[in-house]
């Protein structure tokens, strides 16, 4: 005869790994060409001047410079630019 009750089972105990999304370089900070500025799902932030967009909507710098965030355009969308280093 068992001395302990059966442990039973659970349907919990799983979770997906975090994707580490978000802003990686903030406004006013220096960045090198190719550096990631924002990792995102969809275009929450749009690519502005001297900024490229990867196939997963990651925004990255095309030139060395400083990051600048701005709201502009229809509905005041958020854009990110890289101002080239002088």
Curated annotation (Swiss-Prot):
One Pfam family matching this protein: Ribosomal_L27
How is this protein annotated for GO cellular component? cytosolic large ribosomal subunit
InterPro entries referenced in this protein's UniProt entry, alphabetically: Ribosomal_bL27 (IPR001684), Ribosomal_bL27_CS (IPR018261)
Disordered: where is this region?
1-21
Q: Which GO terms describe its molecular function?
A: structural constituent of ribosome
Which residue ranges have biased composition labelled Gly residues? 1-10
Query: What's a BP term from Gene Ontology annotated to this protein?
Result: translation
Keyword S-adenosyl-L-methionine appears in the UniProt entry: no
- This protein's superkingdom? Bacteria
Please provide the record's keywords in A-Z order: Ribonucleoprotein, Ribosomal protein
Q: Which family does it belong to?
A: Belongs to the bacterial ribosomal protein bL27 family.
- Name this polypeptide is given: Large ribosomal subunit protein bL27
Q: Which organism is it from?
A: Ralstonia pickettii (strain 12J)
Q: Which gene encodes it?
A: rpmA
